């Protein structure tokens, strides 16, 4: 289950969905690629079987930094793709689990080590911390979406309560758009070439979705 759908920018009611599905005995993996720093995410309260999310998108950590949270009763069934010294250790289960994932091959752990510092630093930039940052970003995303919708005389594709720091806008077309041309979407190219603004363009039948990402900077 997505926290926020990347192609559409829709904020899913993932908290309710996790509860409803797990009540039926089904394990849930929450895809929080656009979760940390974008929407409130309490992994203990959510209590999903598995949660994974990126930190380089909204928390501003180095690329390649993410987290994987596995509920304690599910940890014995999960192993890293590359085994290390932890595989043969005789530690207690929780310590063995952590050691197995701590050091796999020659991967540089620096991006992960930046996560707590980034959370503290970015959160200190405004008086209200992360709660204020996320709400400010959300309001700016709605403001930007409404400006574009007014200019295009089009209706917002989603209600405000399904908006986070991301919001998509439909750009109408008379053609049946199946895929973006190899040389790129014309509006995407113009925004980048002339203004150095990079905008994701998602193809849908009869229109393109372009979405606004608004962060603290």
Name every feature range the model reports, one short phrase each.
Residues 46-91:
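Active-site PLP attachment segment
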Residues 135-142, 149-194:
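Conserved PLP-binding catalytic core of the aspartate aminotransferase-like
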Residues 1-33, 37, 58:
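Active-site phosphate-binding strand-loop segment of PLP-dependent enzymes
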Residues 29-31, 52, 79, 157, ...:
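Structural detector of well-ordered beta-strand residues that form the stable sheet scaffold
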Residues 111, 115-157:
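Conserved PLP-dependent catalytic core of the aminotransferase class-I/II
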Residues 95-110:
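A short glycine-threonine-serine/GTX helix/turn-capping micro-motif
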Residues 180-182, 189-217:
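PLP-dependent enzyme catalytic core of the Aspartate aminotransferase-like
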